[in-house]
UniProtKB/Swiss-Prot annotation:
Name the record gives this protein: Ribonuclease pancreatic beta-type
Lineage: Eukaryota, Metazoa, Chordata, Craniata, Vertebrata
Enzyme category, top tier: lyase
Signal peptide segment: 1-25
Disulfides per UniProt: 54-112, 68-123, 86-138, 93-100
Superkingdom: Eukaryota
CDD domains noted in UniProt: RNase_A_canonical
């Protein structure tokens, strides 16, 4: 009986420490909106990216830690313009949800694709500049971008 009580108390302690520990370290979880900005926004970049742009940005923005993110898109427009898409044409997201919005005009983007022969930790990307409509998921009140769904 004492063993079961000790195990229950130990389990409770582990649960509480797991819940409290992140706040003790001073770290806070990145919000979905902040993650979107980190992973997809680069408004200050020139209109034409260098061939090594994706390799540099994917590493700088933390998308090659632990594994290589296969595909990512950077948007080279002011954040306000991208946020405004959340009030434009609503469309169905790839996952079937109804919180996606399509830009009414084309935007300057850079598409990064992991090269087939590339393996972690040496993540190597192709860099493709485009002018396309983007589709983003928005949440909150007011609505803000939280996920890059597609470019068309």
């Amino acid at each position: 009986m004492g063993l079961x009580k000790s195990f229950a108390l130990f389990s409770l302690l582990v649960l509480v420490l797991g819940w409290v520990q992140p706040s003790l370290s001073g770290e806070s979880r990145e919000s979905s909106a902040d993650k979107f900005k980190r992973q997809h926004m680069d408004p200050d970049s020139p209109s034409k990216s260098s061939p090594t742009y994706c390799n540099q940005m994917m590493k700088r923005q933390g998308m090659t830690k632990g594994s290589c993110k296969r595909v990512n898109t950077f948007v080279h427009e002011p954040l306000e313009d991208v946020q405004a898409i959340c009030s434009q044409g609503q469309v169905t997201c790839k996952n079937g949800r109804n919180n996606c919005y399509k830009s009414s005009s084309t935007l300057h983007i850079t598409e990064c694709h992991l090269k087939g022969s590339s393996k972690y930790p040496n993540c190597d990307y192709t860099t493709t500049d485009s002018q396309k409509h983007i589709i983003i998921a928005c949440e909150g009140n007011p609505l803000v971008p939280v996920h890059f769904d597609d470019s068309v």
